[in-house]
């Protein structure tokens, strides 16, 4: 008898509590600020592709869902001939974004990627490229890569050791 009354009392109290479940298609869930969702390829401020096809993203991917092939344009600038991500295998770990030296790969808060056909989850470069610069609007890899710091020689920058002659290390 006591257990039945206790159960009814708990049910009565729960009637006035806020519901935990949200009605998903009608109400959108609150996404955390650092949510790792759909992967995109961004462009630099000049409108060119940021990706230099260095294969670091494919090497960092633990499930091997990234495939790309490098090629060069007439200015000897590398870019991916094709860039393919299989989202049916992707675990959205973000290692590819961390490994990318040019900030070309970025993860967006988009999480609605449900498909009826698994083949539709293989995204090509055209599906991944966006028109804008993404999270880093002023960054252009080719403006800062290999550029000497003004007024300082090699090894003269802060926390930088002077260059080592490899022949001096030989016995």
Swiss-Prot record:
Q: Where does [4Fe-4S] cluster 1 bind?
A: 51, 54, 57, 100
Q: What does this protein do?
A: NDH-1 shuttles electrons from NADH, via FMN and iron-sulfur (Fe-S) centers, to quinones in the respiratory chain. The immediate electron acceptor for the enzyme in this species is believed to be ubiquinone. Couples the redox reaction to proton translocation (for every two electrons transferred, four hydrogen ions are translocated across the cytoplasmic membrane), and thus conserves the redox energy in a proton gradient.
- Bound how, and how many: what does the cofactor note say? Binds 2 [4Fe-4S] clusters per subunit.
Q: Which reaction does it catalyse?
A: a quinone + NADH + 5 H(+)(in) = a quinol + NAD(+) + 4 H(+)(out)
Membrane topology summary: Peripheral membrane protein
UniProt protein name: NADH-quinone oxidoreductase subunit I 1
User: Cellular component terms, GO, for this chain's entry?
Assistant: plasma membrane
Q: Domain named 4Fe-4S ferredoxin-type: which ranges?
A: 41-71, 81-110
> Tell me, what is one Gene Ontology molecular-function annotation carried by this entry?
NADH:ubiquinone reductase (non-electrogenic) activity
Question: Which GO BP terms apply?
Answer: aerobic respiration
For this UniProt record, give its keywords in alphabetical order, as a comma-separated list: 4Fe-4S, Cell inner membrane, Cell membrane, Iron, Iron-sulfur, Membrane, Metal-binding, NAD, Quinone, Repeat, Translocase, Ubiquinone
Q: Which Pfam families match?
A: Fer4_7 (PF12838)
| InterPro entries cross-referenced by the UniProt entry | 4Fe4S_Fe-S-bd, 4Fe4S_Fe_S_CS, NADH_quinone_OxRdtase_chainI
Q: What is its EC number?
A: 7.1.1.-
Subunit structure of this chain's protein = NDH-1 is composed of 14 different subunits. Subunits NuoA, H, J, K, L, M, N constitute the membrane sector of the complex.
Family annotation (PANTHER family): NADH DEHYDROGENASE [UBIQUINONE] IRON-SULFUR PROTEIN 8, MITOCHONDRIAL (PTHR10849:SF20), NADH DEHYDROGENASE UBIQUINONE IRON-SULFUR PROTEIN 8, MITOCHONDRIAL (PTHR10849)
Q: What class of enzyme is it?
A: translocase
Chain residues that bind [4Fe-4S] cluster 2 = 61, 90, 93, 96
Names of required cofactors: [4Fe-4S] cluster
Q: Which family does it belong to?
A: Belongs to the complex I 23 kDa subunit family.
The leader peptide range reads none
Where in or outside the cell it occurs: the entry states: Cell inner membrane
């Amino acid at each position: 008898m006591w257990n039945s009354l206790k159960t009814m009392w708990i049910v009565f109290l729960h009637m006035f509590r806020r519901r935990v479940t949200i009605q998903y298609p009608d109400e959108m869930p609150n996404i955390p600020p650092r949510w790792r969702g759909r992967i995109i390829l961004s462009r630099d401020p000049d409108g060119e592709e940021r990706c230099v096809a260095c294969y670091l993203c494919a090497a960092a991917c633990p499930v091997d869902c990234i495939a790309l092939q490098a090629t060069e344009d007439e200015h000897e600038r590398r870019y991916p001939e094709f860039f393919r991500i299989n989202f049916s295998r992707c675990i959205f770990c973000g290692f590819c974004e961390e490994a990318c030296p040019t900030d070309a790969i970025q993860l967006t808060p988009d999480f609605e990627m449900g498909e009826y056909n698994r083949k539709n989850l293989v995204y090509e470069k055209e599906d991944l490229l966006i028109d804008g610069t993404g999270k880093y609007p002023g960054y252009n890899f080719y403006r800062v890569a290999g550029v000497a710091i003004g007024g300082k020689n090699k090894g003269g920058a802060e926390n930088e050791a002077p260059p080592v002659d490899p022949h001096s290390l030989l016995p």
